[in-house]
Amino acid sequence: MKKYVTTKSVQPVAFRLTTLSLVMSAVLGSASVIAGEKLDMSFIQGGGGVNPEVWAALNGSYAPGRYLVDLSLNGKEAGKQILDVTPQDSNELCLTEAWLTKAGVYVSADYFREGYDATRQCYVLTKAPSVKVDFDVSTQSLALSIPQKGLVKMPENVDWDYGTSAFRVNYNANANTGRNNTSAFGSADLKANIGHWVVSSSATASGGDSGDNSTTINMFTATRAIRALSADLAVGKTSTGDSLLGSTGTYGVSLSRNNSMKPGNLGYTPVFSGIANGPSRVTLTQNGRLLHSEMVPAGPFSITDVPLYTSGDVTMKITGEDGRDEVQNFPLSVMAGQLSPGQHEFSVAAGLPDDDSDLKGGVFAASYGYGLDGLTLRAGGVFNQDWQGASAGVVAGLGYLGAVSADGAYATAKYRDGSHSGNKVQLSWSKQLETTNTGLRVSWSRQSEEYEGMSSFDPTELWSQSNHGRRTKDEWNAGISQPVGGLFSLSVSGWQRSYYPASMTGSYRYSDDNGKETGITGSLSTQIKGVSLNLGWSGSRNSRGENNWSASASVSVPFTLFDRRYSSSASVSTSKGGGTGFSTGVSGSLNDRFSYGLGGGRDGDGGTSSYLNASYSGDRAYLNGVLNHSQSGGTSGSVSVSGSVLAVPAAKDIMFSRTTGDTVAVVNVKDTPGVKVTSGDGQTDSDGNLVVPLNSYDWNTVTIDTGTLPLSTELTNTSQKVVPTDKAVVWMPFDALKVKRYLLQVKQRDGEFVPGGTWARDSKNTPLGFVANNGVLMINTVDAPGDITLGQCRIPAARLQDTEKLQEITCE
């Protein structure tokens, strides 16, 4: 084995070397020698005073001691690690597998079989071929050179991190007031992490001048991931059913395969978009249940972060300042994903209907899917004493022709006046044209008149009741998206829905009702040198032949003024019966936390309007406020706040954060505020804690920004890797070491500088570094060095000052 010792002066992170010391370091750094060879030090000023025995000891063995080393693997930095060198390591450094794994070095057991010390349970890496271990005492660095065959990839079957015990509340609240109305909305997601379980619940509340106040508190749901099955077990408030037959809320238990436990699986997120003629409140409901409510400014908007738990149309209501409502329905069509060959999915659920369901008795559902080469098969069923249904589906890849799915369902519903059975068929096709990058999609569904999905079934009704309403017959959805040469992107989609004739018993039907509704939406967007242009339009026709349409255009231009970045924008919108309105404004930011905007224009009624908004992205919450004024609505305002409150017993702290992700890490650098990470926003609080978002079931690397650490603090490891389960709160402490740094200029009792090359040792005889020219000695040490010995003289510990400033000191 060859060991190298490079004679460099110690360079602490917090110090800058003088030109003289840099030159000295360079000269000494070129004087690397192989152990066993003699080095003539007489050519270096003061080198003749170096003790040959000390020099030989440093070159011939690893000096026992505790070192904070800079680790590198094959020339790549791997962070800092604490290295304990024992007397047994004096000739051969032996590293445990735990130490290597913590450092991110994964070695092949077969390659290093000859170097494994079974007694000490560690690896002598240099016993394997082509391996070099370079431990430089003077710079406290450890360089490992290991061939590719000696390394293995990061283990795939690593243990999941279920996190630590925690309780959190993710909250969102907004309120507005104006001449005609005052309203407020608030929601809270509650989660408690207990062992491998996550207990969740939610609450919403809304109220206003209209007296339509509501409060909803959902029963808890306890979930946990089961790795052996790659499945989620849920107990409590669950949903039982499937996407085609429908579903209902239940109090029970479910076990579902979760393919997102493997990286790369993405889900579908619906988008709800529209146009607001002025500052408005947008409310989303499904099956009579409030999903979401928020204030939006004038112009086009989109809402993309509302989760859906049951199938069915989503109703979007836009309420303006003048109290007028605009209602829009979003027909949803879901296409099941294709499974990889050999991959399977399953779901089993059972429970009693919740308070929002009309069903009586227990509900049981089961489904299974399996992936073949280019083909996915699915089947399922839902059973209740009054409703039973079965479904089957197939998804096939057609190569150049795209992909197609076909699903069918058959259900029997038992009403008060007898049972009725029906069927439903659904077809979907999608294709991405490689040559033009055109995206195409078409879907069609049809159901018989007597088919009733579980979501809308009420066993207390009569089939012949007049309030049964019109029943959907078939529905078409088609869409195309087309980017053009990187200049602009075009998207167009349309839908048509047909109904069976409504019952004439006890109800009124318009004579011109043709039983068919249609709609179309489109958008065109482009961005050229930072300038963005967006065009949008939509139109619909109801079953009586009445048309409705709207269109909008907006442009955004960035500019710089007084070394600050701003963005100016202008938009115009028009709709049938809503007039034409336009607005213009400018936005900017004072820093990375505070942003603002102001502008004005004309609303759809011809009156002028103006607005002022501001937002603050703090470490503990996100705040937003808007002030509006218009001739028709007067002065109005709205405010909103969102954030998270997280209590972690392991941290002995309650943290307020704007991070509201489901899966998070609590980074801790004990009692060290102001520390940042490279993968998130914010900085540690007074207790050294910071909440950082993570991706569940995937490798996450959290790295400390070492530039934000205090000068007296070093970390044993600057990054950690973790694979968290969904909704886990991972406690991630970083061991902080208070490093003692000394910059000394040492003189002997006769006033002469201590000769260069003289080694300094602590009270335990551990090497600390050597003296450079003009008696300069730089020391970094984790433990208090005690008295320092420099050859024949000594520096008492009481005379040492832990400071970055140069200390002149005379040794005894």
Curated annotation (Swiss-Prot):
It is a multi-pass membrane protein. Belongs to the fimbrial export usher family. GO terms for cellular component: cell outer membrane. It comes from the Bacteria. InterPro entries: Fimb_usher (IPR000015), Fimbrial_membr_usher_CS (IPR018030), FimD_plug_dom (IPR042186), PapC_N (IPR025885), PapC_N_sf (IPR037224). GO terms for molecular function: fimbrial usher porin activity. It is found in: Cell outer membrane. Keywords: Cell outer membrane, Disulfide bond, Fimbrium biogenesis, Membrane, Plasmid, Signal, Transmembrane, Transmembrane beta strand, Transport. The gene is faeD. This is Outer membrane usher protein FaeD. Residues 1-35 form the signal peptide. GO terms for biological process: pilus assembly. NCBIfam families: PRK15213.1 (NF011760). Disulfide bonds join 793-811. Involved in the export and assembly of K88ab fimbrial subunits across the outer membrane. It comes from Escherichia coli. Its main location: membrane. It holds the Pfam family Usher.
